[in-house]
């Protein structure tokens, strides 16, 4: 592998600009070589002066890069030292509390089952668990910094070696010895000491001296490009997707030849539509994950996933393919129900019952940690006012806004099975009398409108909670206003529908109000998508017209196509309303909803790419590469004060004025070293050495 590719694959994305600009140096060298005057047409002194002038410029650029790297490394090292002192402080406090309560200095007592612990012991147990996670993330940050150190030194060595080869000189090697090999970022070995001390603390204080268990906890995932999935996972993805495609073709033929034309099919479509949307969402999320990895968007950090254990795009494809097969088989079973002894209404219940069991399965199988993470996140979303809202929380709530049809179809299924289904009839399609009342699919009894508002309500209260935590009216209250427009839209749509059915003369008033609020909501959400969520139309965009100053994805056309797509699908409701109002054929609304629901999932799929890109660029601006985890986090007031200081011109950016404050703060974090630190061992991450000149 060429070193340029190796560097690109192994850098920490959030620190990209702080690495040696290896490609720029290569371009300088090759450009100088191509533009050099030929000895055949000019004298030798002119050639020497040309290369001397170039070398002066080249080494000046090297000095700037070296100064940049030294400064960044020193800042991150100081940050790591402060963080380590804080973690030591918290660990020692936990040990002291435990010593006072139990008289035991080790943590072996916590192995008692959690449900047998007192309230104080439960709190202590959670603190120890949080400390383990905090040390694990801190260790990852140390390895990333050590990787930064090694990659930059290798980059200087490679580019100076290339310089000497092209210019046929040894001044590059001399410059490396004089400047690079004595640079603080290379000579400072404190990072190795911190790594060793962290291993010792985790081994002796948190894992009772079991180094193997400690190192398993601290294990760092491979740094660099996404690792290939296991062969069996790849095989299952191909197998499931292939079977799913074949079954879909079979479904089409079965629908044409087996459906009974004297029965309405809409109960069946409404019941199975939600399952299809969920499968589509999982598959598109797999494409999202693949695209983020390829572009260097660190979604693992953004969602605060465990970097040592999370689902890859292949795992998501596997789950989507497997559920897709079950969905197809269940629907086929409904088509062939007349020749089966099993009642038709059993098949949808079996399908969705299995999906629910797959999610809540308590055994540590079938991606247990990922399922538990999702359940915990869903709990946080539905109890939003009582928790601080993180990115993953409001991201999932946004996904639910695009999957509202699933909730409405779930409500319909419950209502249908409760009130409209004829349980004594087991043949044919799910029975539904076209001439009889069909109130489950209408707004008549009010529940449907409430269910339709649930996703928007979740985001609305999340925005209010974020305003409570930060006291910032913009963007949080303004964002809450955006979601509140959904309440008016749904309310007037329900009033229009019910009044029109009952032939009230004022139904047109509600229709105009419905259209008016649809326009307001679409304009509001469209502007928020493009400007706030995606960060586009930045006045400092420069050559990236109508975009932003920095973009991650390689082609500008992606952004322009996404803007057009978002405009079209945000106003797709105009087609739905136009056709529904002007056409009096039955179930036209169902047909339009069935067509546009997958398109809304696709719109959210595109939205995900640029929303996470914008969040990734925010992390890059803060050089945030790992999760911030603490047993004693800042309270809301302290967090707000810190954010305000960061926004001020004389805040944390002005390091000279606040040096005394930082010094005092670092002093307050000091604590006598734990005894376990004297047993530290060295641990290094080996960076592939690409010495072969052909690979540079």
From Swiss-Prot:
Region (Disordered): 672-696
Localization per record: Cell membrane
Gene of this entry: Xpr1
Chief place of localization: membrane
Catalyzed reaction equations: phosphate(in) = phosphate(out)
Superkingdom per UniProt: Eukaryota
Membrane topology: Multi-pass membrane protein
Function: Inorganic ion transporter that mediates phosphate ion export across plasma membrane. Plays a major role in phosphate homeostasis, preventing intracellular phosphate accumulation and possible calcium phosphate precipitation, ultimately preserving calcium signaling. Binds inositol hexakisphosphate (Ins6P) and similar inositol polyphosphates, such as 5-diphospho-inositol pentakisphosphate (5-InsP7), which are important intracellular signaling molecules involved in regulation of phosphate flux.
Residue numbers marked as site, Gating residue for phosphate transport: 573
Chain segments annotated as transmembrane: 229-259, 265-296, 310-337, 344-365, 389-422, 430-471, 473-503, 507-534, 554-585, 588-626
Subunit description: Homodimer.
UniProt entry tagged with the keyword Methyltransferase: no
Entry keywords, A to Z: Cell membrane, Membrane, Phosphoprotein, Transmembrane, Transmembrane helix
Intramembrane segments: 366-383
Phosphoserine modifications at: 668
Record region (Important for inositol polyphosphate binding): 158-165
Binding residue positions for phosphate: 398, 401, 482-483, 570, 603-604
Family from the record: Belongs to the SYG1 (TC 2.A.94) family.
Domain comment quoted from the record: The SPX domain plays a role in the regulation of phosphate flux. Inositol hexakisphosphate (Ins6P) is bound between two SPX domains of the homodimer. The SPX domain has high affinity for inositol polyphosphates and its affinity for inorganic phosphate is two to three orders of magnitude lower.
Gene Ontology biological process terms, A to Z: cellular response to phosphate starvation; intracellular phosphate ion homeostasis; phosphate ion transmembrane transport; response to virus
Location of Phosphothreonine modifications: 690
Segments on the Cytoplasmic face: 1-228, 297-309, 384-388, 472, 535-553, 627-696
Protein name: Solute carrier family 53 member 1
Extracellular side: 260-264, 338-343, 423-429, 504-506, 586-587
Residues in EXS domain copies: 439-643
Annotated source species: Mus pahari (Gairdner's shrew-mouse)
Pfam families the UniProt entry points to: EXS (PF03124), SPX (PF03105)
């Amino acid at each position: 592998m060429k070193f340029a590719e190796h560097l690109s694959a192994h850098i920490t994305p959030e620190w990209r600009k702080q690495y040696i600009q290896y490609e720029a140096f290569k371009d300088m060298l090759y450009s100088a070589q191509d533009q050099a005057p030929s000895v055949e047409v000019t004298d030798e002194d002119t050639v020497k002066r040309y290369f001397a002038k170039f070398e002066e410029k080249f080494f000046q650029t090297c000095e700037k890069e070296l100064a940049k790297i030294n400064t960044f490394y020193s800042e991150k090292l100081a940050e790591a030292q402060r963080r380590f002192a804080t973690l030591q402080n918290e660990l020692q406090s936990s040990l002291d509390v435990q010593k006072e309560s139990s008289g035991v200095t080790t943590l072996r007592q916590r192995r008692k089952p959690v449900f047998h612990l007192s309230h104080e012991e439960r709190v202590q147990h959670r603190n120890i668990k949080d400390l383990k996670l905090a040390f694990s993330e801190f260790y990852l940050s140390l390895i990333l910094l050590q990787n930064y150190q090694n990659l930059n030194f290798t980059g200087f060595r490679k580019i100076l070696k290339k310089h000497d080869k092209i210019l046929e000189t040894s001044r590059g090697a001399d410059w490396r010895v004089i400047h690079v090999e004595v640079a603080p970022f290379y000579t400072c070995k404190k990072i190795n000491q911190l790594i060793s001390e962290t291993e010792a603390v985790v081994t002796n204080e948190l894992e009772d001296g079991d180094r193997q268990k400690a190192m398993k906890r601290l294990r760092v995932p491979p740094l660099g490009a996404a690792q290939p999935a296991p062969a069996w996972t790849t095989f299952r993805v191909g197998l499931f997707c292939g079977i799913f495609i074949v079954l879909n073709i079979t479904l089409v033929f079965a629908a044409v030849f087996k459906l009974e034309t004297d029965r309405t099919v809409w109960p069946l479509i409404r019941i199975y539509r939600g399952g299809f949307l969920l499968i589509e969402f999982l598959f598109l999320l797999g494409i999202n994950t693949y695209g983020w990895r390829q572009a260097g968007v660190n979604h693992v950090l953004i969602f605060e996933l465990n970097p040592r254990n999370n689902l890859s795009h292949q795992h998501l494809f596997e789950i989507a393919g497997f559920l897709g097969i079950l969905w197809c088989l269940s629907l086929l079973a409904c088509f062939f129900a007349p020749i089966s002894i099993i009642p038709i209404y059993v098949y949808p219940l079996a399908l969705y019952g299995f999906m629910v069991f797959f999610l809540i399965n308590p055994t540590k199988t079938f991606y247990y940690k990922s399922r538990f993470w999702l359940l915990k996140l869903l709990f946080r979303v539905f109890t939003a006012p009582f928790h601080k809202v993180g990115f993953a929380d409001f991201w999932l709530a946004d996904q639910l806004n695009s999957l509202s049809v699933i909730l409405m179809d779930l409500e319909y299924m419950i209502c249908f099975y409760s009130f409209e289904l004829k349980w004594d009839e087991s043949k044919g399609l799910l029975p539904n009398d076209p001439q009889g009342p069909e109130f489950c699919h209408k707004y008549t009894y009010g529940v449907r409108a409430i269910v339709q508002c649930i996703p928007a309500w979740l985001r609305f209260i999340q925005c209010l909670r974020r305003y409570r935590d930060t006291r910032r009216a913009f963007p949080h209250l303004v964002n809450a206003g955006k979601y509140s427009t959904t309440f008016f839209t749904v309310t007037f749509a329900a009033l229009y529908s019910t009044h029109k059915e009952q032939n009230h003369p004022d139904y047109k008033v509600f229709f105009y109000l419905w259209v008016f609020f649809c326009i307001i909501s679409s304009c509001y959400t469209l502007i928020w998508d493009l400007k706030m969520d995606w960060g586009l139309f930045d006045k400092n965009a420069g050559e990236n017209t109508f975009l932003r100053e920095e973009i991650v994805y390689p082609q500008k056309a992606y952004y322009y196509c996404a803007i057009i797509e978002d405009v079209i699908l945000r106003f797709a409701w105009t087609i739905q309303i136009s056709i529904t109002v002007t056409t009096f054929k039955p179930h036209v609304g169902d047909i339009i909803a069935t067509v546009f629901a997958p398109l809304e999932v696709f719109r959210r799929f595109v939205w995900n790419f640029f929303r996470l890109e914008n969040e990734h660029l925010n992390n890059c601006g803060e050089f945030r590469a790992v999760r911030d985890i603490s047993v004693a986090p800042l309270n809301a007031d302290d967090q707000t004060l810190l954010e305000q200081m960061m926004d001020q011109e004389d805040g944390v950016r002005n390091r000279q004025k606040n040096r005394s404050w930082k010094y005092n703060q670092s002093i307050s974090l000091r604590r006598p070293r734990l005894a376990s630190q004297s047993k530290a061992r060295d641990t290094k991450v080996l960076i592939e050495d690409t010495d072969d000149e052909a690979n540079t």
